[in-house]
Amino acid sequence: MSVAFASARPRGKGEVTQQTIQKMLDENHHLIQCILEYQSKGKTAECTQYQQILHRNLVYLATIADSNQNMQSLLPAPPTQNMNLGPGALTQSGSSQGLHSQGSLSDAISTGLPPSSLLQGQIGNGPSHVSMQQTAPNTLPTTSMSISGPGYSHAGPASQGVPMQGQGTIGNYVSRTNINMQSNPVSMMQQQAATSHYSSAQGGSQHYQGQSSIAMMGQGSQGSSMMGQRPMAPYRPSQQGSSQQYLGQEEYYGEQYSHSQGAAEPMGQQYYPDGHGDYAYQQSSYTEQSYDRSFEESTQHYYEGGNSQYSQQQAGYQQGAAQQQTYSQQQYPSQQSYPGQQQGYGSAQGAPSQYPGYQQGQGQQYGSYRAPQTAPSAQQQRPYGYEQGQYGNYQQ
């Protein structure tokens, strides 16, 4: 199948003729038909082989088109094979577009994405996009996540709520975890987190609302939300970087309070909402009131003094992320305060696993913020029996 490609490639640019291009297009058409046929039969190995050949041909043709501005004059009228490429290609009138449509079709086949959407993207972007799309489709599933990632990371430092979504994966996790937590709230969460949070996460207010909804949702489905939030703990790290988040978090908390169910619980939620949407959920599940109170007290302290800690803990954060699963104080040696807090969290029903990360991210930061500065080890050592046990550290 690659004979034409092999024979045409060595030729110089000046030797590219309409016959060569037409031959390549015919070969690509045949390759596409073979790919579709094998795909219908479930022969993935053959599909992959033909797709690689088709990809090379398309890259070659795209290179020719890019290097030869007059290539349009050499291209034949739209070949009939374009009619077989699918609904997206039926409306295309240029051979170069046909090439793109073919490329997008092969990409769509390999990635399972709708060819029409790919076709449109390629056609609009031009020949140079052909090679790009070859790889893009394969990465689209992940890029869709990572695409918002940059927004998250940007928003993360800017807004408190963002931290949760600060990481590209965070947003996804949140939405997924939320899905597990609650179908309806989750959809809201996802939308807010994915859209308003990302785009407006920087604003923070929307994010707060979104998070507050998260917290509220978390309360509604505390157990499940806890599960969903665990992934968030890792996300939390994104917040580490920004002290703003903490400040915003306080605001967040305020909003959360209003949004949250009870003043005490809302506190906990708000607390976490900042970066601890999970916290809020879990808190509600834990022993919301006591935690909440401790949060209120410690929250403010941590916020105020904890910013510097944030940066410190950020390092811990990363450790915490890995260590989150182990809440042991030892895990967060650098974040000694974390451990204590984590322990406190840990004591609180199993949510700790989530908290650990969060605590490191924020809960710890709070507790450690205040105490870490003064005596992280001490805090560590004293997880503080606090009625909340979890937040004992905070209060101290």
From Swiss-Prot:
GO molecular function, one term: transcription coactivator activity
InterPro entries the UniProt entry points to: SS18_N
One GO CC annotation: nucleoplasm
Residues covered by region (Necessary for interaction with CREBBP and for the recruitment of CREBBP to the nuclear bodies): 387-396
Pfam family, one: SSXT
Compositionally skewed regions (Polar residues) per UniProt: 107-122, 128-147
Region (MFD domain): 246-317
Motif SH2-binding: positions: 50-53, 353-356, 391-394
Region (N-terminal auto-inhibitory domain): 1-148
Summary of the tissues where the protein is detected: Ubiquitous; with lowest levels in spleen.
Biased composition (Low complexity): 90-106, 199-229, 238-261, 311-369, 384-396
Position of the signal peptide: none
Motif window: SH3-binding: 371-379
Location of region: Necessary for nuclear localization: 334-396
Region annotation (Methionine-rich intra-molecular domain) ranges: 149-232
Cellular location(s): Nucleus; Chromosome, Centromere, Kinetochore
Biological processes, Gene Ontology terms: chromatin organization; dendrite development; positive regulation of dendrite morphogenesis; positive regulation of DNA-templated transcription; positive regulation of transcription by RNA polymerase II
Keyword annotations: Activator, Calcium, Centromere, Chromatin regulator, Chromosome, Kinetochore, Nucleus, Repeat, Transcription, Transcription regulation
Residue segments, region Disordered: 72-162, 192-280, 311-396
Assembly: Homodimer. Dimerization may be necessary for its function in neuronal dendritic development. Interacts (via C-terminus) with CREBBP (via N-terminus), EP300 and SMARCA4/BRG1. Interacts with the nBAF complex. Association with CREBBP facilitates transcription while the association with SMARCA4/BRG1 suppresses CREST-mediated transcription in resting neurons.
Family statement drawn from the similarity comment of this UniProt entry: Belongs to the SS18 family.
Cited function: Transcriptional activator which is required for calcium-dependent dendritic growth and branching in cortical neurons. Recruits CREB-binding protein (CREBBP) to nuclear bodies. Component of the CREST-BRG1 complex, a multiprotein complex that regulates promoter activation by orchestrating a calcium-dependent release of a repressor complex and a recruitment of an activator complex. In resting neurons, transcription of the c-FOS promoter is inhibited by BRG1-dependent recruitment of a phospho-RB1-HDAC1 repressor complex.
Comment field on protein domains: The MFD (multi-functional domain) domain is involved in transcription transactivation, nuclear body targeting and dimerization.
Protein name: Calcium-responsive transactivator
Organism per entry: Homo sapiens (Human)
Taxonomic lineage from the root: Eukaryota, Metazoa, Chordata, Craniata, Vertebrata
